[in-house]
Amino acid sequence: MILKSFLLGNLLSLCMKIRNSVVVVGLYYGFITTFSIGPSYLFLLRARVMEEGTEKEVSATTGFIMGQFMMLISIYYTPLHLALGRPHTITVLVLPYLLFHFFWNNHKHFFSYRSTTRNSMRNLSIQCVFLNNLIFQLFNHFILPSSTLARLVNIYMFRCNNKMLFVTSSFVGWLIGHILFMKWVGLVLFWIRQNHSIRSNKYIKYLVSELRKSMARILSILLFITCVYYLGRIPSPIFTKKLKETSETGETEEETDVEIERTSETKGTEQEKEGSTEEDPSLFCSEEKGDPDKIDEREGVNGKEKTKDHFNLKERWYNNKTVYRDQEDNTAYGDGNQEDWELKALKLKEEKKLFWFEKPFITFLFDYQRWNRPFRYIENDQFANTVRNEMSQYFFNTCPSDGKRVISFTYPPSLSVFGEMIQKKMSLCGMKELYPKDKNLYNHWVSTNEQKRDKVSKEFINRIEALYGGDIVLQKRVRLCNDRDEKECLPKMSDPFLNGSYRGTIKELYSNSIINDPITSTYNSGEKFWINRIHSLLFCDLNDQAIRNKSSEIQEIKKKIPQRLYRLTTDLEQDEGEDERESVEFPEIRSRKTKHMVIYADNEENTNIFTHTGAGTTYDPENDQMEEVDVIRYTQKPDFRRDLIKGSMRAQRRKTVTWEMLQINLHSPLFLDRIDKNPFFYFDISRIINLIFRDWTKKKPEFQTSNFKEETKKEDEIEETWETIAFGQVIRGFLLVTQSILRKYIVLPSLIIAKNLVRMLLFQLPEWYEDFKEWSREMHIKCTYHGVQLSERKFPKNWLKAGIQIKILFPFYLKPWRKSKLRSHHIDHPMKKRKKQNSCFLTVWGMETDLPFGPARKGPSFFEPIHKELEKKFKKGKKKWFLFVRIFKEKKIWVIKRVLFIKGVMKELTKANPVFLFGLKRVYDGSENRKDSISNNKTISESPIRKSPIRTGSMDWTNSSLTERKRKDLSDKTTTIRDQIERIRITRDKKTNFLTIDMNISPNETSYSDKRSESQKPIWQVSKRRSTRLLYKWRYFMKSFIERIHRNVFLCMINLPRINTQLFLESTKKIIDKYISNDEKNQSGIDEKNKKKIHFIFISTRKLLSTISNKKTNNSKIHCSLSQAYVFYKLSQKPGIKKYRLGSLFQYRRAYSIKDRIKDYLEIERIFHSESKHKKPGNFGMNEWKNWLIGNYQYNFSYTRWSRLDPQKWRNKVNEQCMIKNKDSKKTDSYSYEKDPLINHERHILYSADLLQNHKKKLSKRYRYDLLSYRYINFGNNSSIYRSLLQVNEEQRILILSSHSHIIHKYEQLNLPAISDYLEERFIVDMEKKTDRKYFDLRIIKFWSRRNTNTDMDLRINTNKKNNTGTNYYQMIDKKDLIYLTSYQEIYPRNKENNFFDWMGMNEELLYRRISNLALWFFPELVLLNDAYKTKPWTIPIRLLLFNGKKKITETQKMNENKKRDLGILSNQKKYLELGTRDREEKKWWDQEDLRPDTKYQEYFGSDVKNQKDVELDVWYREGKSREQEDYTDINKSRKKKQSKSNKEAELDLLLKRYLLFQFRWDDSLKKKMINNIKLYSLLLRLMDPKKIVISSIQRGEMWLDIMLIHKDLPLTKLKKGGVFTMEPLRLSRKWNGQFLMYQTLSISLVHKIKQQTDRRYRETKYIDENFFDLFIPRNGRVFVNGDNKNYDLFVPENISALRRRRELRILSRLNPGKGNINIIFSNRKKIQNCKPFLDRGKHLETDTNKAIKFKLFLWPNHRLEDLACMNRYWFDTNNGTRFSMSRIRMYPRFGIS
C-alpha cells in the first residue's frame, strides 16, 4: 500500500509538472492559435484550390510561416516591434500594397512577360505569392483583427519566467497545427477531385470548373469586402481635422506622447532649455498621468531598449513648467554640475534640429494628438479645457510576494522611478542594494512567517490562560508609558503606537508667503533644518551651499491638473453664441442634425407685445429687441456622428454583431436574444412553434400587454410612406386642409341640423343654441410637421415641402341630448369620470388621432347613449312584464286551487246521494270487479228507462262491434293499473303523516275512469249522483274535514310563536357574537355550523340585550352571563386544552362569580368535577401554547415574521401592524369627507368619541376574557406569575398585579385600533399591492380631547397684510402634536406629581391615552418609528424633554403674537395657540419657563442631584446661549454684507451654509412644463383673440403660471416657494453594532427557537436551558445571545485579541506551506478542552460544556473569506468593488450536533 501510494503520488506530481511546464503550455497555445483563421488564410487556400503549381503552393506556405515567425521575433526585437506596431507605418504599407495587389490581379500579363520556366523561383509571380502571404500575416493583428486566441501568447508572456522557451514552443505548436490543417485541406480537395459522383455529374463538374477559373476574382472580392468592412468604421488617418490649440498659461501642465519629436508642439523655448532630470520633485508625488495613446509601454530609440520611466523623465525635460529655476540667470541648479547640464541641452537641441523634417510628414500621416479614446468630448465646467486621465491602466514592475519576485501589472509608476533614483544614489554612496538578490529569499520569508505565527499564537494562549485564572483580559490599544505604576503615558497626538483619529489631523505649519517673507522666514535663522530626510539623501552634493542659498525659491509641492490642448465647441454652441472666446472658422464637435423653425417674426418695429403691471417686474421690453423666435427641431434619423470630435479616431468595436443586410443600430451580442429578429433565420424553435400552433390553441393571454412598440412602429411606417411617395407632403397637405374645411363647415353643421330635425319630429325640444355654441369652440390650428402650434389662419413656412399638421382644439362631438345640470342622477361619480378629450390631430381620412401619424381614436358614439337609454327602458318594461306574469301565475294557481276545491266538494255531495235522478249508466268504480260492472250494465239495459230520449244511444253502445269492446277492455286495464298506483302512493303518504289538500284519502274516491265517464255525462246527472253520495257519507266527510282543519291550522298557530322565537334568538345571537368578538369570529377557524348548541346561551341572550342597550351608562366591571358562557364555550372547543377542574373559580365571591346554570353545564361537559379537586393539571409546554395561539391571526406568523419581531415589540404592538383597512366599513364617511370636509367635521368628532368609548369597553372585556384564560391554562403552575388570584386576599392580589403588570395589564398598555376595520392575516404582508389607494379619514387622528372637549378647525381671515386678503384653512393634521404639547397642562392639570421619565406625559393612564392610527393615510414605514417613540420615548433623549417646563403665556401675549404667526388652532375654550419668530420665542422661553426638575428627579438620583443641579443647569444654559450667540453673530455679519436681506433670509442662508445640501431641481416635469409654455406662447402670439384659449389652457393645466414669474434676477425665496429650489438635509448612515454583525454572520446556519416564544425580560435572567443546542433550527431567526452584555464577547474566542492581531493570526495560520496548512493550535481538541473549568464557572453560561465547545469551534473557522477580501485588495491590487463579492459568499458549514 505504501508503495502504491508512493507511486501514485509521484505520478501525480509528474503530471502536475508536465502540465505546468512552459513547453507544454506553449505548444497548447500555439496549437489553439491555429484555429484563429483570419483573412491571411485566403491567399494560402487560393494557391491550393487553383492548382497553380507546386512552386506557388510552397512559396505561399513559406511566406505564411515566415510572417508568423516574424511576428514572434518582433516581441523581442524592439525596432521590428515599433515598425510593425505603429499605426502610421501600417497605413503607409497597406494602401500601396492593396493598390499593387488589385493591379496585379487585373494585369497579370505585364508581370509574367518574358518569364521562362527554366528557373521557376525567379518568376515574379511566385515571389508575389510569397510576399502576399508574408505581408498579410503581418497585417492580421492590426488592420484585420483576428480572434482573441491569437493574443493569448502575449498574455502568457508576463506569467512565465523562461519567455524564450515559451515563444519557441508556441511557434512549434502553431507550426504543427498549421501543418495538420493544410493536410486536412489537401485531403478534402483530393476527395472532391477523385469523387466519382462529382465527376460523373456534368452540372457539378461544370460548376467546379467555373469556380476554379474565377477563384482569383472571388478571393479578390472577399479580400476587398473584408478590408472595407474593417476599414469602413475608421476614418482615413491621412486626412484628419487639425484642431487649433488654445493659449496656455503657466498653470497648465501639458501631456504629450512619448516620442521626442512630439515635443515641438509645446510652447516656449526657454522652458525647454531649463529643467531637471532627477531633481523634479513632482516626480516623487505625482502619479503617472497616462494618456490612452500610451498603450505600448516599451519604446526604443536608435535600437536601444528603454523603459517607460526614461521617456517620462524626458517628457519632464521639455514639458514641465514647474521646475525649480533661478529667475535671474536662467540656470538650473539640478546636480550642481552646470556644465554637464548645458552639454545635455545642446545635444538635445541638435537632435531636435536633425529631425525637423519628420514632424510634418508624421503628423500628416498620423496625428499623435488625435482624440481617439475617449472620442466623445466631456466638458468640465470648472476648467477651460477637459481634464486628462491621470492614471494609466497598466504599469509593469517586479515586486516581492510570498517570498518570490513577481511581475505586478499595476505597480505605481512614481514608486518605480523613485526606487531607481534611490538605487543609483545608494550605489554611488557605496551602500548595499535596495533589493538583495538572495536565493534563499523564499526560505527567509517562510521562517519569518513561522516566527510571527508562533509569537502571535503564544500571545493568544497566554490570554486564554489568563482568562482561565479568572481575569477578563481583553486586548486594548497599547500605549507608550514612561512609568507603568503611575501610568504616565504620552499624549495621544504624540503616541506612535496609536493611529487613525487618535493622532489628530496634520496641520500646515507654514505657507509660501511665510517662507518667502524675509522677516518671518526661519531659514536664515539659527534653526536650519531639512524638510525631508530623503531630500538630503538624494541631493548629497558637495556644493550644497548654493542649494541652501536658493532654497527660498522652493515652493510647496502641489499637483497640477493636466489639461488637453483644445477647448472645443459644438455646432449648437457656435450657432447660439454661447462660446465666449473668438469664434472659430468651423466648430470642432458635431452636434445632432437640427433645423431652426421660426415660430415668431417681429415685422413691426418697436411693438410692445407684453404689458407689465406691478412694481416687482424688472423685465424691460425696450431692451429686448427680439426679431425672431425659433425652435430647434431634430431629425428623426439615426445620427451616429453626434457629439463626436471631428477628425477623431473611431474605436473599432469588436463586441458588435451584424445579422441583417441593412442594420439600423449597433447591438452587443449580449442582448442578441432580446432583440426581435427572424426566428426562421436564427433557428428559434420555440418561437417557430408558437407561430405555427398559435391559432390552434385559441387561448388568449392572461394579461393584455400594451402594444406600444407596434404602435410606434406603425407611426414610423406611415411617416416613411408619406416621405417616400413622390410629392407626398403636397398631397397630404391638401388632403388635410380639405378634411379640415369639410369637417368644420359642412359635415358638423349638417349633422347638427339633422339631429335637431329628428328631435322636432319626435316632439322634443331642439338644441340649436347649445350645439352651435359648442361647434363654434372647435378650432383648427395649423402646426408644423412635428406638431409645433403656429396659428389658426397662418400656414407654416414651406408647408408644402416640409409638411403640415392640423390640430383640433375642443373637438365637437354630436350628442343626442344635453344633460341638465338639475338632474342629479346624470352626474357621474368622480372616480368614474373620464378624462375629457380636449385636443387631437386630424388625419388625411378625416379621423382623429392623439399623435401625428398615430392610430385613429374612437370618439364618443352618437348612438351609444340612445342604445343605453333604450336598454334601460327595455329592462324596466321587462321587469314590469315579469311582475305581471308572476302575479298572473299566482292568481291562476289560486283560481285552480279554488276550482279543484269546489270540485272536491261536489264529488263528496254526489257520493252521499244514493238516488239516481235519471236513467243513466252506473259509473264504473275501480274498487268493484269486472262481473259487477257487467251485471250492472245488464240491469241498466233491462230497466224501463230505455224509453228515454237517449235509448238509441245506449242501444248502439251495447250492440257495438268487437273492436270497440277490445278497445274498451284495454282502457279498463290501464285505468285499473293507474288506480292501484294511486292507492299505493296514498297509503305511503299516510305513513309519513304528510297531509295535502289535493289528496283524497277516501277509498271511494272517484277514479280516472269516473272522471272520464263523467265528462261524457250531463251535469245534472253528475250533480244528482254526487248529492246522493254526499248525503250518504256526510258524517264521514265532516269528520275528515275537522281533522284537516285541526292539523293544518291549529297546530301551525300553536307552533308559530315557538319557531319565530327560536329564529329570533338565533339571529340575535349571531348579531351579538359579531358585535362582541368580531375579530375572533374571523380568526378562530371554527365552523359555525358545527358548534354545540348550548341552551343557556339562548336564555342569557335576552338578559344581555338589556345590558347592551344601557352600555353608555353602565360602567361596572361585572361580567354578564353571556361573557362567562362565551369564555367557557371557547375553552371547551380548544383542542389543545384539557378539561381540568376550576374549583377555586366557583368558590370566589367577587366579580368573577359564575352562575349556577354554567356550573351545571360544566359538570355535564366534565370540565368541572367537585370530587377531583386534588388533581392538578399537567404543565403546558410551548407546543400546546402555540396551538392555542394559532386560533388568533395576530399570533399566526411565519418563521420570517417571527425572526423580524422582538417579543416585547410583538406584545406591545400586536394589533398596531401595517394592516389593510376594510374599505367597506368607512367608505361612505371617507367619500363624504372628499366632498366637503368642513361640513362633516363635527359629525366625525362625535362619532370618534363614541368609537373611542366603545373601543375601551372592548379592551376591558377582552382583558377579562384573556385573564380568565390565563388562569385556566396555567392553573397547575407553581410560579407566582400564574398564581390564581382567586385564592389570595385583596392586598396580595394588588401586589401580584403590580409585580407582573407586563402579563396581566398588558392590554391596558396597548393603544389598539378598532378591529372591525381590518382584514385577516393573509392581507398583512402585501399591503401596498392589495389596496387601490390610500384613504384619508379624519377619524383616524385622535387628539387629546377629553370627554367634554372637542377640537374644531380654525377658520381665520388674515387681515394683517394690506395688499393680500384671503382665507386660510389650517389643517390640524400637520400640527397634531403641537396641540398636546402646549395646551395639555392648561386644559387638564394633573393632581399627582410627575415622574422624572414622564416626558410629554408618555406614562399617562390608558384613560387619557390617544389612539393614533396613522398607517392608513401616512407612510407606513414612518409609522413604525412613530410608534417606537410613543412606546419608548427615552430612545430620543432630548434635553428639553427632561424638564417639565410650564408655559405662562397670557391672553394678551397670544393676541399680540397673532400678527406674526402662521398656525392657529381654536379649541372650545377659545384659546389661541401660536408660534412666533425664533428670537422672540427663545427669549420668552428662557424667561418664562420653569426649568427646575421635579421632586421625583431628586428622589431618584439622591443627594448628588441637589449638588450638581445648579451646575448642570448653568452649563446647559450657557451652551445654549453660546450657540445662539454664534448663530446670531453670523447673521449680523451677513446683514452687514447684504442689507436687503431680512431676518428669515439670513437664517435660511445660515441653515444652508451649515447643515444642508441644496440643488436646483431641473427635473422632467419642470422641463415638460417649460416646453408646454413655449408652445402655448408661440400660439398666443398669432391668435387674434387669445383671451379664451389662455383661460382654457390655464383651466386644463397646460400652462404653468409659476414659470411665467421666473426671470433673470429672481430671488431665492421665490424660487423656493415655487418649488424650483428645494432643500433636503444630509442623511446619516447607520452604524451597526457588534451583536447585529454577529447575527448576520451566524444567521445562515443557526437560529434559536427561544426567540420565537421568550420575552426580552426573561433573557436578562442570565440562565440558559439545558437543552440549549437541541433548540437550534436552520435559518429564520436571530442568534441567541446571553443577557449579560459584559461577557458577551467571550462567545467568540478571537475577540480576546485585538482586530489587527486576529487578522494576523488567521493569515499566518493559513500561510504555513511547510506543514500542509494545518492549524495545530485550534484544531487540537484536547488543548481547547483545557478551558473546561473556565467555561463551567460562574455566570451559568452552559451546563453541557462539550456542546458549548462545539459552538465555539464553529465560531472559529479555519478559512475566512473576509480576510481574502483584504488580501485581494493589498496583494493583488484589484482596487474595485468586486473584491467584496467574495465576502458575500458564506462557506460556514452547517452546525451538526452529535
Curated annotation (Swiss-Prot):
Bias (Basic and acidic residues) ranges: 259-276, 286-307
Topology in membrane: Multi-pass membrane protein
Transmembrane segments: 23-43, 64-84, 87-107, 124-144, 172-192, 218-238
Subcellular location: Plastid, Chloroplast inner membrane
Biased composition annotated in UniProt, kind: Acidic residues: 248-258
Main location: plastid
Domain of life: Eukaryota
InterPro entries: TIC214 (IPR008896)
One GO cellular component, as annotated: chloroplast inner membrane
Task performed by this protein: Involved in protein precursor import into chloroplasts. May be part of an intermediate translocation complex acting as a protein-conducting channel at the inner envelope.
Family, as annotated: Belongs to the TIC214 family.
Subunit-level organization: Part of the Tic complex.
Protein name: Protein TIC 214
Native source organism of the sequence: Amborella trichopoda
Chain's gene name: TIC214
